C-alpha cells in the first residue's frame, strides 16, 4: 500500500466497496430524474477529459507525488471522488493532471472507464466561477450595497440562489453574498486536486499540514473541540486542537488566537501560519484558517462544508500570524 493513504482495515475496504455500489445506484437514479438540459451540461464537462479517472477507495485523501514512488516529494493532495486526467500508467502508478497540477498517484485508487463516467456524473457540483479579475460580493442584491469581500478570477463558490440579474453565493462562513450575473459563469464542475509546495518548509510544519488533512471532511460543530468522528470542531476548535498536538497552546476563540504569535504578511506567510477573517459582524474577527500554501487554506468552514479547503482570499484577511515560534 502506498504510504500516502491512511491505513484501512479489511472491514473499511469492504465498506468502501459498498459505498461505491450505493453511489452507482444513486447515480443511475439521479440521471433518470435530471432534465435533458442538465444531462447535456454534465456530459459537456466530461468531454473535456480524454482519459478520465476518479479517485476512489481512500478514506480522507491521497498524496500526489513528483515521481512514481513514495520516495518522491509530495506536491499536492487529492480527495475521494475527485477527477483526474490520466496521462500514463506504469508499474502500479499513474501520472495524472488535475487542478492545474501534474503528479503521480497509486493506480490502485483510480477508477476508470464507465464506472468513472457514472461516478463523475453523480459527483458534479453546480457552482459559480468568477470571470473577471475581481468581483465584490455584496450584502444585498442591489447596486451600492455594502461589500462583504472581493472574489478573484478563477475561484469557484457554491450557489445558494439565483435571479435574472444576481447570483447568491457563499461568501464568508455561513454568510451569502451577491454578485452580478455577468461576472460569473454558473455550471457544473468536478472536484480536482489541490496543489501546494512544502519546499523549504520545516519538518514540523510539513507534519502539521499533513495532520490537518487527516481531518478533511470532518464535522463542523459550533463551539466543538473534539477532533473525532463522534465529536466535531468549529474553526478555532480545529486550530486549537491541531496545534496542541505540536506543542502550541492556543486560546479557545479566534479573536483571542489572533493575539498570539508574530504578525506576517503576504510576502512572508508560510504553510502552517494562521489567517484570521471577519465573521458575521463587520470589523470583528470571527474566523480562523490554516494556510497550506499556493493561496489555499484548510479550515472548519461551516455546518454545510465541514473541514474543507478554500482560497485564502475567500474573505478579507484581517491579520496573519506565525504561532509556531520559528
Predicted regions mapped to residue ranges:
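...with weaker cross-activation on analogous glycine-rich loops/strands in unrelated enzymes
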Residues: 248-309, 313, 326
Amino acid at each position: 500500500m502506498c504510504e500516502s493513504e491512511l491505513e484501512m482495515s479489511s472491514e473499511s475496504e469492504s465498506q468502501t466497496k459498498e459505498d461505491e455500489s450505493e453511489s452507482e445506484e444513486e447515480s443511475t437514479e439521479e440521471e433518470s430524474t435530471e432534465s435533458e438540459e442538465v444531462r447535456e451540461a454534465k456530459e459537456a464537462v466530461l468531454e473535456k477529459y480524454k482519459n478520465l479517472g476518479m479517485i476512489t477507495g481512500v478514506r480522507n485523501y491521497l498524496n500526489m507525488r513528483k515521481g512514481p514512488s513514495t520516495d518522491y516529494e509530495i506536491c499536492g493532495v487529492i480527495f475521494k471522488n475527485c477527477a483526474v486526467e490520466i496521462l500514463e500508467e506504469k508499474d502500479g502508478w499513474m501520472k495524472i493532471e488535475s487542478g492545474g497540477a501534474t503528479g503521480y498517484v497509486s493506480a490502485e485508487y483510480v477508477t476508470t472507464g464507465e464506472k468513472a463516467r457514472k461516478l463523475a456524473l453523480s459527483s458534479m457540483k453546480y457552482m459559480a466561477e468568477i470571470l473577471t479579475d475581481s468581483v465584490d460580493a455584496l450584502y444585498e442584491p442591489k447596486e451600492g450595497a455594502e461589500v462583504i469581500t472581493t472574489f478573484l478570477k478563477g475561484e469557484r463558490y457554491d450557489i445558494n440562489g439565483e435571479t435574472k440579474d444576481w447570483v447568491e453565493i457563499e461568501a464568508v462562513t455561513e454568510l451569502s453574498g451577491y454578485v452580478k450575473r455577468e461576472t460569473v459563469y454558473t455550471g457544473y464542475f468536478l472536484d480536482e486536486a489541490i496543489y501546494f509546495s512544502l519546499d523549504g518548509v520545516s519538518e514540523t510544519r510539513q507534519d502539521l499540514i499533513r495532520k490537518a488533512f487527516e481531518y478533511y471532511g470532518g464535522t463542523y460543530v459550533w463551539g466543538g473541540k473534539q477532533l473525532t468522528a463522534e465529536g466535531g470542531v468549529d474553526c478555532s476548535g480545529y486550530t486549537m486542537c491541531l496545534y496542541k498536538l505540536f506543542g502550541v497552546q492556543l486560546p479557545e476563540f479566534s479573536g483571542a488566537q489572533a493575539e498570539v504569535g508574530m504578525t506576517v504578511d503576504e510576502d512572508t506567510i508560510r504553510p502552517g501560519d494562521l489567517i484570521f477573517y471577519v465573521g458575521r459582524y463587520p470589523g470583528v474577527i470571527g474566523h480562523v484558517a490554516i494556510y497550506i500554501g499556493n493561496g489555499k487554506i484548510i479550515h472548519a468552514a461551516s455546518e454545510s462544508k465541514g473541514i474543507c479547503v478554500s482560497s485564502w482570499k475567500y474573505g478579507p484577511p484581517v491579520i496573519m500570524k506565525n504561532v509556531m515560534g520559528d
